[in-house]
C-alpha cells in the first residue's frame, strides 16, 4: 500500500486546484491511499517556534514524512507560490536537520483561469522543493491555463495521462 499526501495550495472552499486534484486522484490505483494535509490552520513559521511542540506543525511533518509521495495542486498568487503553501514547505524543513522533504517524491500541478496557468508558481515550487531535497516529477508538467470547473475532454485526458505517470512513479519506490 502506497500513501500519497495531497496538499492544496488554495485555502478557498471552492478551489479550482482542489477540483483538478480530485480529478487526478480519481485515477489512483486501489493500492494507493490518499491523505489530504490540511494547511488552513497552520501558524506562520517562525524559527522561534522550533523548540516548542506545536501540534499543527507536528501533524504536517508526520503526514509528509509518512507519505510515499506528495501531490501539490496550487494556484498562483501574484506570480508566485501562495503564502499558505510556502509556509507548509518551510515548516516541513525544520527544525534544522529534520527536513521531511528530503528525497520525498513530489508532483506539482498548477491551474489558473488566466492565460499563464500558474506556471510562475509551478516553477517557483519546483525551485524551492528541489532546493530542500525533494525529488520532483520532471514530466509531464501540468500548468493548466484558462482552467475552469468544467474540464474539456482534452484536459481530462491530459490529467489522466499525468495521473498514470504519477502513480507509476510513486509505485517505483
What is each PLM-predicted segment?
Residues 8, 38, 110:
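Short beta-strand/turn micro-motifs composed of small residues
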Residues 13-16, 45, 80-81, 117-118:
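Secondary-structure boundary/capping motif
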Residues 39-55, 148:
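N-terminal beta-loop-helix "entrance" segment that forms/cooperates
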